[in-house]
Curated annotation (Swiss-Prot):
Keywords: Amino-acid biosynthesis, Aromatic amino acid biosynthesis, Glycosyltransferase, Magnesium, Metal-binding, Transferase, Tryptophan biosynthesis. This is Anthranilate phosphoribosyltransferase. Mg(2+) 1 binds at residues 100, 233. Signal peptide: none annotated. Homodimer. Its EC number is 2.4.2.18. Pfam families: Glycos_trans_3N, Glycos_transf_3. The gene is trpD. One of its GO terms (biological process) is L-tryptophan biosynthetic process. It comes from Shewanella sp. (strain MR-4). It catalyses: N-(5-phospho-beta-D-ribosyl)anthranilate + diphosphate = 5-phospho-alpha-D-ribose 1-diphosphate + anthranilate. 5-phospho-alpha-D-ribose 1-diphosphate binds at residues 88, 91-92, 96, 98-101, 116-124, 128.
Length: 347
């Protein structure tokens, strides 16, 4: 769309009114194609933020970004079990160990098909991609190789900038604004593998139910959207607020560590460090040599993923399966296999 054709949509926004899903998709398509002036983009993002983005607007922005993404070749014939993503928005302000990335290895080793969509760090010192780079896992692995890893190893990591080139047009504006915008919630919603199942952590309790409604609008089959006492994942240090999408309905409830069959820990026990230090922690956990707090934090998140995939009938049973998988050494073996495939592809 040209600058003149998006003007009526911007006028609606600047009057404090909401856009439809289709109208928002049109605006974001223009942005992704690099056809939106930066001043206009800043105005659009701030108008959305100040009024508060609606379910339809977040869904429309996600539609545009999904449509423009580099395709992920995973035919429906290979989707019999369904794919899950274990992902957080980031930006919760805490520097924890890489819980969701480590949980992805555990869930995959326990039988889930995990396509984890990730990026470099938002709030911690070490994001999902920073950690994987430490293990020699190539972030720019071709979509074809990533698809083969998902098929043969149950796990692949999809580096967001590799699939969503158009987002680069928003980077200078986002950096200049220095405040959260709709982009902070879009990352987890635009996985190019289009997972049927999602364990999605959000940085604010106010986002839990709205983001579950967005997943419902986007056609996700089953999901848990969680906020864990300040963290964008299931909490070991307190209660977790959950909106679960199942059979087209959303139910809201709270979980505590006792619901998973593990003891509560202190937040300080989950603090992470630089990527090299976090890589050491992840390796220890996957080898069955992590601290109780680290191991349990990973297991309760992997346990929710296993529950969502239908591999366990409760989050408690899922956590037990995750803990047994860690003890078996299968998750550590998977880390080594993925690193090996990645390094061979780079030779």
């Amino acid at each position: 769309m040209s600058a003149t054709s998006i003007q009526p949509l911007l006028d609606i926004l600047f009057q404090g009114k909401a856009l439809t899903r289709e109208q928002t998709a049109s605006l974001f398509s223009t942005l992704i194609q690099g056809e939106m002036n930066e001043a206009v983009m800043a105005g659009m993002l701030m108008a959305l933020k100040i009024r508060g983005e609606t379910i339809a607007e977040i869904s429309g922005a996600a539609d545009a970004m999904r449509a423009a993404a580099k395709p992920f070749p995973y035919p429906s014939s290979m989707r019999t079990e369904g794919i899950i993503d274990i992902v957080g928005t980031g930006g919760d302000g805490f520097n924890t160990i890489n819980i969701s990335t480590t949980a992805a290895f555990v869930a995959a080793a326990a039988g889930a098909k995990v396509a984890k969509h990730g990026n470099r760090s938002v709030s911690s010192k070490s994001g999902s991609s920073d950690l994987l780079a430490q293990f020699g896992i190539d972030l720019t692995m071709s979509p074809e190789l990533a698809s083969r890893c998902l098929e043969s190893l149950n796990l692949c990591f999809l580096f967001a900038p590799h699939y969503h080139g158009g987002v680069k047009h928003a980077v200078p504006v986002r950096q200049a604004l220095k405040t959260r915008t709709i982009f902070n919630v879009l990352g987890p919603l635009i996985n190019p593998a289009r997972p049927e199942f999602m364990l999605l952590g959000v940085y604010s309790p106010e986002l839990v139910t709205p983001i579950a409604r967005v997943l419902q609008a986007l056609g996700t089959q089953r999901a848990m959207v969680v906020h864990g006492s300040g963290l964008d994942e299931v909490a070991l240090h307190g209660s977790t607020q959950v909106a679960e999408l199942k059979d087209g309905e959303i139910i809201e409830y709270q979980l505590t560590p006792a619901d998973f069959g593990v003891p509560q820990a202190q937040m300080s026990e989950l603090e992470g460090g630089e990527p090299a230090q976090n890589a050491q922690i992840t390796q220890s956990i996957l080898q069955g040599q992590g601290s109780d707090a680290h191991t349990h934090a990973v297991a309760i998140n992997a346990g929710c993923a296993l529950y969502l995939c239908g591999l366990s009938d409760s989050v408690k049973a899922g956590t037990a399966l995750a803990l047994n998988t860690i003890k078996s050494g299968k998750a550590f073996e998977l880390l080594n296999q993925l690193a090996k495939v990645s390094s061979e592809a780079q030779e």
